[in-house]
Amino acid sequence: IVFMKFKGRGILFGIIMVTYMLPTAATYIPSYIILANHQLLNTYTGLIISSSVSIFGIFLLRQAFMQVPSAMVEAAQIDGASHFRILHLVVFPMTKSSFITFGLMSFIASYNNYMWPSLITNDSDKYMVSQGLRSFFIEGGAYGTEWSLVMAASAVIVIPLLIMFAFAQKWFIDGIGGDTGVKG
């Protein structure tokens, strides 16, 4: 959409930005009803589908695509490349760090999400990490909480995030900086 010129392009972006301004809690009831109508409550599919689209991701990747020099896109068009080929061979390599950054940020957000998964799941086998930690915390009751175990569980829960960041650190920093790959 960034490189295509069509009528209503600005209006489409405005609609996307308005949806980004909606509080997440305002979407809980409509999303719950949609998942219930499709029998996706308390399923992994419901958890995945409900978090698969991100308005923040659309905005982040749009901004990254806007950093790609239009001369490179025009050169690919002159060479006869299709829109998909331009995306695959020109735009994606130049914005790879933004994709990795978005993937890492999405994983962290989903990993830490507590409210939405607790609304659509009631089976402890399908709990997300934050729900599992809370149930582990609640099991001890008000006076029987084993704080050493809760803190150990919290430390273990952070390990996958640290590993992912360690592997993606180079691209994460580049994605935030907005490197376009053009010198001069």
Identify the residue ranges that each predicted region occupies.
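A structural signal for multi-pass alpha-helical bundles of membrane permease subunits
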Residues: 2-184
